[in-house]
């Protein structure tokens, strides 16, 4: 089970990423555009660097919804492998069956 502070930190990162998403995209578009001047690119880079570090989506970590575990996370279900197995054995995930051959 992950610490509550780690879960809260991830929640804060998601909120910041949503808050600054449009600003970040606009600045990145200016930086990548071949039609913008060097001065505009430079200013956009400086503004990007002044944004909060946690507002970048690459700082986020996928975590299990039930336990907050960061490793062995399965995107399709939003759970870690252990919690997915437990839920599958209880029959809580429709269409998911244990493999046998």
Curated annotation (Swiss-Prot):
Q: Which organism is it from?
A: Buchnera aphidicola subsp. Cinara cedri (strain Cc)
Identification of the protein by name: Small ribosomal subunit protein uS14
Gene name of the encoded protein = rpsN
Complexes and interactors: Part of the 30S ribosomal subunit. Contacts proteins S3 and S10.
User: What NCBIfam families does UniProt report for this protein, alphabetically?
Assistant: PRK08881.1 (NF006477)
One cellular-component annotation, GO: cytoplasm
Q: Name one GO molecular function term.
A: rRNA binding
Q: Which UniProt keywords apply?
A: Ribonucleoprotein, Ribosomal protein, RNA-binding, rRNA-binding
Report the protein's function: Binds 16S rRNA, required for the assembly of 30S particles and may also be responsible for determining the conformation of the 16S rRNA at the A site.
One GO biological process from the UniProt record? translation
Superkingdom of the organism of origin: Bacteria
Q: Which InterPro entries match?
A: Ribosomal_uS14, Ribosomal_uS14_bac/plastid, Ribosomal_uS14_CS
Q: Which family does it belong to?
A: Belongs to the universal ribosomal protein uS14 family.
